[in-house]
């Protein structure tokens, strides 16, 4: 074991240690001396550096947000308010500056006893002032949010009230920047859901800007459409119709492009879902199309699809639930109360009543975000009274087809019979080729009539009426089937004819004879287009769901005054003679007059290919149910009429050769609006009813509409005068006013 030897301090080692210690002590003394002498300069420089960095920091933030307008919630489509963000940052910077300056000043005062007059006394008060303002902002205080006028945005006020109560019901509202303030509600409702006017100081929505990048260009061939429709056997009848009419369609789109500017139109993403052709619907329309089944819906669908395609829009066609789910898979199951952001799957949806139920079930909660895009093909129309679920229930209506709570103008009809809806229409087909057209003009009219009724039961109890006609001319028919018990023996029955053969027969014929059924079909228009006069049976009393089984369950109380109201009202004599079948003298006088007149073929423009293209293009470009403001038709078309008690707005407008325009009701729903048209309201109230706005002339009492979905051209008030918005229309294009294009 080694012994420990104690260390002995030599004089040499001691000297080295003392020298080293002395050197270190001297350097430290020198350092503190220099530091004390330069302290005032260092504190000043430090302050300047901090302030300079702060300025540069704020400047950098400003540069990064140069395109964002200042004000509350100035960031577009974000969950953050730039002012609040900067407030927090500035608050942090000011706190640090305050602490640093306090320490520096203490060093200066305590360390040197000089420079006690440094201009720092104002800083604490400035900092305190800033802290108060910053704290106010952080705690939710906002600068005053000046809201623009809400004229033209009838839903805005109601939506704001709803947001005040319900904005916490879904976290998605906060994600869009909603924080409980009116301004945040307004920004959300103007930029995300489009119910309110856009605030002028706000930057534009980048998603809306992106949406306008792709433009529609007209198409002049059908190759892509044929390929698309070939995949479905259900489309066979429609595909054949489109092929037959292809030349006429292409000529029509070229002609329309020469007459009006079809450039700079946004190319829309369009979904077409034919619910009636799905297997789940239970209908056999596609299967019976070639064997005498109903064709009206297929005619309208094929003409709509053709129009959308030629106008240059991107269309996707669905005829099964599987296809519908595949197209909409991105949003199926989305339970958010807010719409999805970014590239839209679809922007327009054409659908039928059957498909509507399928669409709602498929989308689930997401349905609400697509309601405004819907355009529902609805032959007989849906009146507001049946569309509004609560109102329909309160009236005891049990129709399976109504209660959708859409804007009534989203329902597209076969004829312009329901002004609360939109008139889509169809094209009356010309079945002739170029050589036929040359030959058909040489055909001489014979002293013969053709009866409109291909089913034997339509002829029941009509012999006396037909006997009168037979007194003056031959009677022909196109009845199919073995049963002919109701057909008089003198009738020459041709059976089912092809479209081409039917047109040649019509060219030989002077009179097309209505039997009272079917209602509102396309055949009378084909007859008139081939130079026939149409004998149109009058209904007295008018037929409706109140007295006719055929209309029971349909979502309308519309009254038909004749077999073909469109022909009666919008065409009339000399082409259309509306008569009471039970008045033998009236029938005989009409037949004599028709035999003594010479009329040319007439086709209303709205039932031609070009007319339909023009109308659908106007609807796509102008109709907008996803934004709050109603901008079309233009207000210049408004003509106000007062209906007498017991008279509907549809009637009073029609008497003046005008159309009731439901879009204008919102401009007649306030005291000040009434004054413009010399109606003075000494008192007023709100009511949720289809018969308002109305005016009681005895008491000068006005009743205004409390529910915008109940504005209705139909319905007559028993005591008040209804205040009615009418408009003019283009002859042969009823859906459009003279200033609408």
UniProtKB/Swiss-Prot annotation:
Location of the protein in the cell: Golgi apparatus membrane
Residues where substrate binds: 378-379, 554
Annotated membrane topology: Single-pass type II membrane protein
Metabolic or biological pathway, per its Swiss-Prot or TrEMBL entry: Protein modification; protein glycosylation
Phenotype upon changing residue 287 to A: Decreased catalytic activity
Induction annotation: Induced by IFNG treatment in monocytes (in vitro).
Post-translational modification: N-glycosylated. A secreted form is released from the membrane after cleavage by gamma-secretase.
Main location: Golgi
Sufficient for catalytic activity as annotated region, ranges: 213-741
Enzyme Commission numbers on file: 2.4.1.155
UniProt-reported outcome of changing residue 30 to D: No effect on the biosynthesis of the secreted form
Impact upon substituting residue 526 to A: Loss of catalytic activity
Outcome of substituting residue 31 to A: No effect on the biosynthesis of the secreted form
Known function: Catalyzes the addition of N-acetylglucosamine (GlcNAc) in beta 1-6 linkage to the alpha-linked mannose of biantennary N-linked oligosaccharides. Catalyzes an important step in the biosynthesis of branched, complex-type N-glycans, such as those found on EGFR, TGFR (TGF-beta receptor) and CDH2. Via its role in the biosynthesis of complex N-glycans, plays an important role in the activation of cellular signaling pathways, reorganization of the actin cytoskeleton, cell-cell adhesion and cell migration.
Name of this protein: Alpha-1,6-mannosylglycoprotein 6-beta-N-acetylglucosaminyltransferase A
Organism: Homo sapiens
Gene giving rise to this polypeptide: MGAT5
């Amino acid at each position: 074991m080694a012994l420990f030897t104690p260390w002995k301090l030599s004089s040499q080692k001691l000297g080295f240690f003392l020298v080293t210690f002395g050197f270190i002590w001297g350097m430290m003394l020198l350092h503190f001396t220099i530091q004390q002498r330069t302290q005032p300069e260092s504190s000043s420089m430090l302050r300047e550096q901090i302030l300079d960095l702060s300025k540069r920091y704020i400047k950098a933030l400003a540069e990064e947000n140069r395109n964002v307008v200042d004000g509350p919630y100035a960031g577009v489509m974000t969950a953050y308010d730039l002012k609040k963000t900067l407030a927090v940052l500035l608050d942090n910077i000011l706190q640090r500056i305050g602490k640093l300056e306090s320490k520096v000043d203490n060093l200066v005062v305590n360390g040197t006893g000089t420079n006690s007059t440094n201009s720092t006394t104002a800083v604490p008060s400035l900092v305190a002032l800033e802290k108060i303002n910053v704290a106010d902002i952080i705690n939710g205080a906002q600068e005053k949010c000046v809201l623009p006028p809400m004229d033209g945005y009838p839903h805005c006020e109601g939506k704001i009230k709803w947001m005040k109560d319900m904005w916490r019901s879904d976290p998605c509202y906060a994600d869009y920047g909603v924080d409980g303030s009116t301004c945040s509600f307004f920004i959300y409702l103007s930029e995300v859901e489009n119910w309110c006017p856009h605030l002028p100081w706000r930057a534009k929505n980048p998603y809306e800007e992106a949406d306008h990048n792709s433009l529609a260009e007209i198409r002049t061939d059908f190759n892509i459409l044929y390929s698309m429709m070939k995949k479905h056997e259900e489309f066979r009848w429609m595909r054949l119709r489109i092929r037959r009419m292809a030349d006429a369609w292409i000529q029509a789109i070229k002609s329309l492009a020469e007459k009006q500017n079809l450039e700079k139109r946004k190319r829309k993403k369009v979904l077409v879902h034919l619910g009636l052709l799905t297997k789940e619907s239970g209908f056999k329309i596609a299967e019976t199309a070639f064997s005498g089944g109903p064709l009206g819906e297929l005619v309208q669908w094929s003409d709509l699809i053709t129009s959308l395609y030629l106008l240059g829009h991107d269309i996707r066609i669905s005829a099964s639930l599987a296809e519908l789910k595949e197209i909409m898979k991105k949003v199926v199951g989305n339970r958010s109360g807010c719409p999805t952001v970014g590239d839209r799957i679809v922007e327009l949806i054409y659908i039928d009543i059957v498909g509507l139920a399928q669409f709602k079930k498929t989308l689930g909660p997401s349905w609400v975000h697509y309601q405004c895009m819907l355009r529902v093909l609805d032959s007989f129309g849906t009146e507001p009274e049946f569309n509004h679920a609560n109102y329909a229930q309160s009236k005891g209506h049990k129709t399976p087809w109504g209660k959708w709570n859409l804007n009534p103008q989203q329902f597209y009809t076969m004829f312009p019979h329901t002004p609360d809806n939109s008139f889509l229409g169809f094209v009356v087909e010309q079945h002739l080729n170029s050589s036929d057209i040359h030959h058909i003009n040489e055909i001489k009219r014979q002293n013969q009539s053709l009866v409109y009724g291909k089913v034997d039961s339509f002829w029941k109890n009509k012999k006396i009426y037909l006997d009168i006609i037979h007194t003056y001319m031959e009677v022909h028919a196109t009845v199919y089937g073995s049963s002919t018990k109701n057909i008089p023996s003198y009738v020459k029955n041709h059976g089912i004819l092809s479209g081409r053969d039917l047109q040649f027969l019509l060219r030989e014929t002077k009179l097309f004879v209505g039997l009272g059924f079917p209602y509102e079909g396309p055949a009378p228009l084909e007859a008139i287009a081939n130079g026939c006069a149409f004998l149109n049976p009058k209904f007295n009393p008018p037929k409706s769901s109140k007295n006719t089984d055929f209309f029971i369950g349909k979502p309308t109380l519309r009254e038909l005054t004749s077999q073909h109201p469109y022909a009666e009202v919008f065409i009339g004599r000399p082409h259309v003679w509306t008569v009471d079948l039970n008045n033998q003298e009236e029938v005989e006088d009409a037949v004599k007059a028709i035999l003594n007149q010479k009329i040319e073929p007439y086709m209303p423009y709205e039932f031609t290919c070009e007319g339909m293209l023009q109308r659908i293009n106007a609807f796509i470009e102008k109709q907008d149910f996803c934004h709050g403001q109603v901008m079309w038709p233009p207000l210049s078309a408004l003509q106000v009429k007062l209906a007498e008690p017991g008279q509907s707005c549809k009637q009073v407008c029609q008497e003046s050769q005008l159309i009731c325009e439901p879009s204008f009701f919102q401009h007649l729903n306030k005291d000040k609006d009434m004054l413009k048209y010399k109606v003075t309201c000494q008192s007023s109230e709100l009511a949720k009813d289809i018969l308002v706005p109305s005016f009681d002339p005895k008491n000068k009492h006005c009743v205004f509409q409390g529910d915008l979905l109940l504005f209705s051209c139909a319905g007559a008030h028993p005591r008040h005068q209804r205040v009615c918005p009418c408009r003019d229309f283009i002859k042969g294009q009823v859906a459009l006013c003279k200033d609408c294009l």
